Swiss-Prot record:
Residues 32-86 are annotated as: Hypervariable stalk region. The chain crosses the membrane at residues 15-35. Residues 36-470 are virion surface. Its EC number is 3.2.1.18. N-glycosylated. InterPro entries: Glyco_hydro_34 (IPR001860), Sialidase_sf (IPR036278). This is Neuraminidase. It is found in: Virion membrane; Host apical cell membrane. The active site is at residues 149, 402. Glycans are attached at residues 46, 54, 84, 144, 293, 398. The influenza A genome consist of 8 RNA segments. Genetic variation of hemagglutinin and/or neuraminidase genes results in the emergence of new influenza strains. The mechanism of variation can be the result of point mutations or the result of genetic reassortment between segments of two different strains. The gene is NA. Residues 89-470 are annotated as: Head of neuraminidase.
Length: 470
């Protein structure tokens, strides 16, 4: 066979294969379009597939048309009812670890926000850790000077509980240097306070959208709880302060429904001081244990009813729970007046258990170090010093900080009572340590029906960081 014949033969074979391939495709399309629909099949294969991406559930509806996938992203369905939250608190014999974020340890090499004032709040399906960022990362030059409380860079963000406050999983909530947040059963409501000291504004967000505002009424650093607000049957309550931190200020309770303020009342508390309340629902009322930054080493107590009537006083227990404070033996306690004659203070919490009270406090009397929780017999109603139980959460060799309360709703636990929980902030850096920054991590504990051994779940980061050595 000469070269020309070889070329003709190869070309003929190739052309034949191409024609055969085309015929096969025509037959395949004919069977798919004409035969299958004739058997009562629409030609579409519809199914909903649930896949997990980056620890967030995303629902995909996949429609197959003639070997082509059409993917539609469906938003997670919202609950159609409000949480009740009128149940009593569960009785707690001890508190077990729920989560620990280790944010500062991870932040020596990870992309972790510089934060303060972390707190936890829960919806019917999840609990989230909220925190106030400084608009900067750990081990970065912008972390310099973040000991400052108020700046235009501070924002409220959140992650699923247990996650570190990292840039990849954090969700923006509000521009804020003071904040609170809670879920009514349908959507998250957040309140972020920002702006100049004399004319600060609190912006209410509902479902991520700004829905209302509160302007400063006393012109002196409008501020709020730095912990979870409280929703009962769709109505959410929170406490705000405006005025001096070291003498008489002004205090108000607000009520909102679906992000719109529907009521407010001024708290008359002459001679007393209320800041940074830690609140929780209990038997249809909101119970708050707050901070007296003026004189008292006992904590203010505020009980709010649905009509915004209230009872205000001090935690009766004969042991102080603020810091700094004097000796336990020298403290007598009062249900109505500040005791101890110590200025300054730290955010804290307590839980009523009948007439008894669980109250948290730093172990140190003079600094924010160590943390313990005590159960005082009749401490909610009397000046009792009788400790029923004590549990150490952070030993006195390690730094602590703010602490606050929240509850696990019955939708999460399937119980007939609300589980009492608390978090402890562990502040690192300035002013106690030689760094250019101030930040914190947290440990979260929840009430259980068993006693829990003492231990120290402290922060554990080794300081200084590289940025501090430059």
């Amino acid at each position: 066979m000469n070269p020309n014949q070889k070329i003709i033969t190869i070309g003929s074979v190739s052309l034949g294969l191409v024609v055969l391939n085309i015929l096969l495709h025509i037959v395949s399309i004919t069977i798919t379009v004409l035969v299958l629909p004739g058997n009562g099949n629409s030609g579409n294969c519809n199914e909903t597939i649930i896949r997990e991406y980056n620890e967030t559930v995303r629902i995909e509806k996949v429609t197959q048309r003639h070997n082509t996938n059409v993917i539609e992203y469906i938003e997670r369905p919202e609950s159609d009812h409000f949480m009740n939250n009128t149940e009593p608190l569960c009785d707690a014999k001890g508190f077990a670890p729920f989560s620990k974020d280790n944010g500062i340890r991870i932040g020596s090499r990870g992309h972790i926000f510089v934060i303060r004032e972390p707190f936890v709040s829960c919806s019917p399906t999840e609990c989230r850790t909220f925190f106030l960022t400084q608009g900067s990362l750990l081990n970065d030059k912008h972390s310099n000077g973040t000991v400052k409380d108020r700046s235009p860079y501070r924002t409220l963000m959140s992650v699923e509980i247990g996650q570190s406050p990292n840039v990849y999983q954090a969700r923006f909530e509000a521009v804020a240097w003071s904040a609170t947040a809670c879920h009514d059963g349908k959507k998250w409501m957040t309140i972020g306070v920002t702006g100049p000291d004399a004319k600060a504004v609190a912006v209410v967000h509902y479902g991520g959208i700004p829905t209302d505002v509160i302007n400063s009424w006393a012109g002196n650093i409008l501020r709020t709880q730095e912990s979870s607000c409280t929703c009962i049957q769709g109505e959410c309550y929170w406490v705000m302060t405006d005025g001096p931190a070291n003498r008489q200020a002004q205090y108000r309770v607000f009520k909102a429904k679906q992000g719109k303020i529907i009521g407010q009342t001024e708290i008359s508390f002459n001679g007393g001081h209320i800041e940074e309340c830690s609140c929780y629902p209990n038997e249809g009322k909101v119970e708050c244990v707050c901070r007296d930054n003026w004189t008292g080493t006992n904590r203010p107590v505020l009980v709010i009813s649905s009509d915004l009537s209230y009872r205000v006083g001090y935690l009766c227990a004969g042991l102080p729970s603020d810091t700094p404070r004097g000796e336990d033996s020298q403290f007598t306690g009062s249900c109505t007046s500040p005791m101890g004659n110590q200025g300054y203070g730290v955010k804290g919490f307590g839980f009523r258990q009948g007439n008894d009270v669980w109250m948290g406090r730093t172990i140190s009397r003079t600094s924010r170090s160590g943390f313990e929780i005590l159960k005082i017999r009749n401490g909610w109603t009397q000046n009792s010093k009788e400790q029923i139980k004590k549990q150490v959460v952070v030993d006195n060799l390690n730094w602590s900080g703010y602490s606050g309360s929240f509850t696990l709703p019955v939708e999460l636990t399937k119980r007939n009572c609300l589980v009492p929980c608390f978090w402890v902030e562990m502040i690192r850096g300035k002013p106690e340590e030689k760094t250019i920054w101030t930040s914190s991590s947290s440990i979260v504990m929840c009430g259980v029906e068993h006693e829990i051994a003492d231990w120290s779940w402290h922060d554990g980061a080794i300081l200084p960081f590289d940025i501090d050595k430059m």
